[in-house]
Amino acid sequence: MNISYKISNSIKNLEQYINLYNSCFSEDKFNLDYLNWLYNKNPCGHYIGIDCFDNDVLIGQVGGMPIEFFWKEKKLKIIISINVCVDNNYRGQKLFSKIADKFEMLVKTNNFDGIIAIGNKSATPAWIKSINLTNLGELEAFLGLGEINEDNFDSSQYDFYSCWSEKRLSWRLNNPNNKIF
């Protein structure tokens, strides 16, 4: 094995990401249009992450998407982790912890305020152990429909939230895998 780590390149490496994701995840939802939309057209910024290679073969990745959140009405730059995986043939070698550690340093270097990792039952302990994330509990969310805007949303009732601008909402509705119209 010749393991190396590189900063993710979401313009150049989409084909490699598709191959890795489709081998690690049960759904075959990954394609060029979808990943280009998700990683390169997000109005909050491009995908940021660490890729792990064995020679020239992508075997793992930890990364995420920039999203603006508010904590007690202060705007924060946060990374939400997505599509985190290690190839089945390389699991059990502590690669996730090594990649996650490098990812945490990359996030700090790029002046983000934090990482949100929404993990399943097997991923959550790995996140906590690898970079000492704090488990805040299960995700609670609400969705509002209709005329929700700054005039009728009382942000003082919520400590932590994200507001979806027209630009972000339009981007989200243009997901090529989930056409709305």
Give residue ranges: language-model regions.
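Conserved N-terminal entry element of GNAT/NAT acetyltransferase domains
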Residues: M1-K12, E147-N152
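Amide-forming acyltransferase catalytic core, primarily the GNAT-like/NAT-type
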Residues: Q16-N22, S26-Y47, C52-F53, K108-F112, ...
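Exposed loop/turn and edge beta-strand positions of beta-sandwich/beta-sheet ligand-binding modules
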Residues: H46, K75, I80
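Conserved beta-strand in the GNAT
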Residues: G49-D51, V57-I67, I80, C85
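Glycine-rich, histidine-containing beta strand-loop boundary motifs that form or position
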Residues: V62, I118-K121
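A short, polar/charged loop-to-alpha-helix boundary motif
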Residues: E68-K75
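Conserved hydrophobic beta-strand within the GNAT/NAT acetyltransferase core sheet
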Residues: S81, G114-I118
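Conserved acetyl-CoA-binding loop-helix of GNAT-fold acetyltransferases
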Residues: V86, R91-L106
